Amino acid sequence: MKRIGLLGGTFDPPHIGHLLLAQEAIHCADLDEVWFVPVGIPPHKEREEIASNDDRLAMIKRAIKGKETLFNICTIELEREGKSYTIDTVRTLTKKHPDVRFFFIIGGDMVKSLPTWKGIDELLATVTFIGFKRPGVLLDSPYQDQLMLVEGPEVNVSSTMIRERMTEGKPISYLLPLDVERYIYEKGLYKTNESRKSPSVSKTSSN
């Protein structure tokens, strides 16, 4: 049976933290693939607060370029109208792919919020949650015995941080793949400072 991890999020924008989580999940849970699942309208946000579906999808494609044998994109939530709930996505995917064992990848901060998730008991019975925790940090959750808890690399990077740095005119290089960074500047996302130039590969000269 194929083992596929689901990594949901707004990916606004996708960054190195997302890629590291996906890579570590493949290693720790012996996954065949990780599917990035960009949400349409997340339950806790409004539509105008996030970049368009087309822009976020384009950035994910650039982020996983060259790694398509391990990373893929599932657009099921972008195609669904209204707010996106994980339980609806899992129900659809398990029905469509009965020969796949699904894992759902979450960060340590989300482990604590699991009791508030819609249909959490059904989710726990249907998929295996992979919860990443920071080294030395104890997680307090009534469901922690039902999760696969692993210690992953600690990367203090978030999409919010990147957007804020953009609005402040600060560099975002090395926080996300170069192709994603270029796309952000080319499309003028996140109120980019027009005086800043899009990153480019510097040319080296021989002496």
Curated annotation (Swiss-Prot):
Q: Which GO terms describe its molecular function?
A: ATP binding; nicotinate-nucleotide adenylyltransferase activity
Q: Name one GO biological process term.
A: NAD biosynthetic process
EC supergroup of this enzyme: transferase
- Give the EC number(s) listed in the UniProt record: 2.7.7.18
Q: Which Gene3D superfamilies match?
A: HUPs (3.40.50.620)
One of the Pfam families matching this protein, by short name: CTP_transf_like
- What pathway does the UniProt record associate with this protein? Cofactor biosynthesis; NAD(+) biosynthesis; deamido-NAD(+) from nicotinate D-ribonucleotide: step 1/1
**What family does this belong to?**
Belongs to the NadD family.
Q: What does this protein do?
A: Catalyzes the reversible adenylation of nicotinate mononucleotide (NaMN) to nicotinic acid adenine dinucleotide (NaAD).
Print the keywords alphabetically: ATP-binding, NAD, Nucleotide-binding, Nucleotidyltransferase, Pyridine nucleotide biosynthesis, Transferase
Reaction(s) catalysed by this chain, per the record, are: nicotinate beta-D-ribonucleotide + ATP + H(+) = deamido-NAD(+) + diphosphate
Protein name as it appears in the record: Probable nicotinate-nucleotide adenylyltransferase
Which top-level group of life is the source organism from? Bacteria
